[in-house]
């Protein structure tokens, strides 16, 4: 079936995002314990400044405590590791920098092939009205939440370029999550919709899932309060 098929079968699903810069291998068991019990569907590993050695070590630690797929969330070729199951092979569609549109992908593709990773082609969109780390590092022309038609147009571009998923990213630690109406409009075009950033409560996660999000990503909430993150997982699973 593959990892992407597994995720599609479990929608709405929950993805735990671990940034190896913030969560080291020795911290993985404690962070993941409550999330695995709550039913998180997969673990994503990566971040804006993570490097291969850090990623590989965290993936190995996850393998020891969780029997769920491990999906790479790379910041570039340096975010790839051979011991994961799959990779979100992303293009940052609203970046001003061609490196994040295609150059990083050209450098990373041979590694994906060599490592035998399942590739999930993904249109990555940074949305909102504030400067998060990912928007700064990715040199993104951030799309405000109220420009719904523009966001949908980007998502349609991803769909017609053959991408399997669209990732709506408000950014790690964002003050607000992606609004349900934006999620509703994007999921309505018939593309697998991943939503992350600013999700701090079970109620918010439930609203986004009800709006059509296929996958809900929590990262900072996981690192700060694993038990709260577990409640978010349970809220999604109760639908």
Curated annotation (Swiss-Prot):
Residues that coordinate or bind sn-glycerol 1-phosphate: 167-173, 197-198, 219-220
One Pfam family linked to the record: PcrB
Alphabetic keyword roster: Cytoplasm, Lipid biosynthesis, Lipid metabolism, Magnesium, Metal-binding, Phospholipid biosynthesis, Phospholipid metabolism, Transferase
Subcellular location: Cytoplasm
Domain of life of the native organism: Archaea
Cofactor(s) demanded: Mg(2+)
Annotated GO biological process: glycerophospholipid biosynthetic process
EC annotation from Swiss-Prot or TrEMBL: 2.5.1.41
Entry-linked PANTHER family: HEPTAPRENYLGLYCERYL PHOSPHATE SYNTHASE, PTHR40029
NCBIfam families: GGGP, GGGP-family, PRK04169.1-2
Protein name: Geranylgeranylglyceryl phosphate synthase
